[in-house]
Structure formats: C-alpha cells, structure tokens
C-alpha cells in the first residue's frame, strides 16, 4: 500500500483511505492491483528476460487494457532496475531531476519499491512511496521526479499515452 510523506512538514499519511483521498485531491490516479497473481518465478526477479517481461504484461493484461481504455493510453513496457543495472547511480541522478511531461506518467509496481516526489497543488512536494501492486498516474504538467527506496530495486510496468513514451521537460 502506498504511503505519503509531505516534505515541508515531514508528515506521513499511511492509512489506505486517507492516502487514496489525498492523491485524488491532488489529481493523482492511484489504484491497487492484485499482485498475488504474479507467478512465483517472477516475484522479486530483477534480471528479466524479454520472455519474463512479456509474461508480466500478460498476467496484468486485463488491468492494463482497463486503465488504457479509461484514460486513453496506447503503449506499455516493463522496466527493471537494481544494483545489477549498469550505471544505476547515473540513471538515478538523471531520474531525480525535477521535470514534467505533457502527458501522464503511469507506473505499476510489480516488485521492489519506488518513490515519486510530486509537486502538490499548493506548491509543496510530497513523496508517494510505492509497493508491489500500486499503480500511480502522475498528471500531465505536474512537476515531479522518481527515485528508488533503500532496497534500490524495482520492476514496473510503464504505461504511455503515445507509442513514443514520455519526454521530460526540465
């Protein structure tokens, strides 16, 4: 279950109902998908083959189709980051640069953890700490950045409005 940390006042929101309400008020789509249907050999697997990635997409194909139909998404893929990822530290430095996109940035966490820091409507940033089963859509034009939690590993399905993917605007 996602948790929220508001930067300026270092306040945490951990209750599921309160997290959902907070994100809805900020215009952030949040859903919880059933992660238990992921096959055991794909859980906490950060060295994915193309076949593994295709299998992950197949497992969640109904959910992907549903959110895509509701929100106009056209493409998706699977990414994996861990300490075995070449140049992970350089990638994280790049990910942590505040930016926005002209379309939604959507991620579903399959394994591991991630954090989206998002600028709220009041101008203060808040973290959305994501766990397996969490789907988030950062709204278009919302300033944000992404990083990993202390375990430094994540497998995520990325869902895009266009087949070209997101273009960051710094």
UniProtKB/Swiss-Prot annotation:
May play a role in transmitting local conformational changes, annotated site positions: 104
User: Tell me, what is one Gene Ontology molecular-function annotation carried by this entry?
Assistant: iron ion binding
GO:BP terms for this protein? L-methionine salvage from methylthioadenosine; L-methionine salvage from S-adenosylmethionine
> What keywords is this UniProt entry annotated with?
Amino-acid biosynthesis, Dioxygenase, Iron, Metal-binding, Methionine biosynthesis, Nickel, Oxidoreductase
- Site label May play a role in metal incorporation in vivo, positions: 98
Q: List its EC numbers.
A: 1.13.11.54, 1.13.11.53
Cofactor(s) needed for function? Fe(2+); Ni(2+)
* Superkingdom per UniProt: Bacteria
Catalytic activity, as annotated: 1,2-dihydroxy-5-(methylsulfanyl)pent-1-en-3-one + O2 = 3-(methylsulfanyl)propanoate + CO + formate + 2 H(+); 1,2-dihydroxy-5-(methylsulfanyl)pent-1-en-3-one + O2 = 4-methylsulfanyl-2-oxobutanoate + formate + 2 H(+)
In this UniProt entry, which residues are annotated as the site Important to generate the dianion? 107
Pathway where this protein functions:
Amino-acid biosynthesis; L-methionine biosynthesis via salvage pathway; L-methionine from S-methyl-5-thio-alpha-D-ribose 1-phosphate: step 5/6
Sequence positions that bind Ni(2+) = 99, 101, 105, 144
- What Pfam families does UniProt report for this protein, alphabetically? ARD (PF03079)
Co-factor binding comment: Binds 1 Fe(2+) cation per monomer.
Q: Which residues bind Fe(2+)?
A: 99, 101, 105, 144
Query: Which family, according to the similarity comment?
Result: Belongs to the acireductone dioxygenase (ARD) family.
Subunit structure comment from the entry: Monomer.
Annotated function: Catalyzes 2 different reactions between oxygen and the acireductone 1,2-dihydroxy-3-keto-5-methylthiopentene (DHK-MTPene) depending upon the metal bound in the active site. Fe-containing acireductone dioxygenase (Fe-ARD) produces formate and 2-keto-4-methylthiobutyrate (KMTB), the alpha-ketoacid precursor of methionine in the methionine recycle pathway. Ni-containing acireductone dioxygenase (Ni-ARD) produces methylthiopropionate, carbon monoxide and formate, and does not lie on the methionine recycle pathway.
Which HAMAP family does the record associate with it? Salvage_MtnD
Q: Can you name this protein?
A: Acireductone dioxygenase
What is the scientific name of the source organism? Bacillus thuringiensis subsp. konkukian (strain 97-27)
Encoding gene (name): mtnD
